Amino acid sequence: LKKILGITGVAIASVALLAACSSKSSKEASKSSGAKETINFATVGTTAPFSYEENGELTGYDVEVAKAVFKDSDKYEVKFQKTEWSSVFTGLDSAKYQMAGNNISYSEERDQKYLFSYPIGTTPAVLTVPKDSNIKKYDDIAGHSTQVVQGTSTATQLTEFNDKHSDKPVELNYTNENITQMLTSLNEGKYDFKIFDAPTVN
């Protein structure tokens, strides 16, 4: 596999640890008893270096930041919940989770429903293709196939690409596979390219 850096037209927003205490979030935890309120923190756990498992424990930048935030709190304790990406926002909406972090990018649509922390970084994207690919630059993806995860910035980006290239759209195959599985599929020639966050694929 090879990576094409600096993709033209990629608009990746600043990554933020999603302080998504959604408007539906329950705040009636037993404060009168003096017990700490549990903050359920959703993360996928397969997107190193942001969120991954090591020795059976969740870690990564987003996870460690959350641990540091709550370390000395006398009101809250954080409990990390591993889940699929497709369940992160539905879980926030239903108050199953009160926070989430998984290299989550900011968007105006998400800002209408969730509270974001200050940005904690920016994430460049890379276009990853097999070594013998004829895709040399971003515009070459027209008419080719890829995998995307619903609700990600990549899915939005490629949908917008197809709107502008309706005569030769990218074939979008939606999946819940993790990064390792998607790289394997790409290497086996099942798909033509994949856009990844650079730190994750590196």
Where do the language-model regions lie?
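Bacterial N-terminal signal peptides that target proteins for export
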Residues: 1-8
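C-terminal motif of bacterial Sec signal peptides marking the signal peptidase cleavage site
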Residues: 17-20
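Bacterial signal peptide processing site
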Residues: 22-24
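Extracytoplasmic small-molecule ligand-binding "clamshell" domains
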Residues: 31-103, 175
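Bilobed "Venus flytrap"/periplasmic-binding protein-like clamshell domains
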Residues: 41, 45-48, 58-72, 124-180, ...
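Acidic, polar ligand-binding/catalytic clefts
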Residues: 67, 79-140
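A ligand-binding cleft/hinge motif common to bilobed small-molecule-binding domains
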Residues: 87, 102-112, 157-162, 184-202
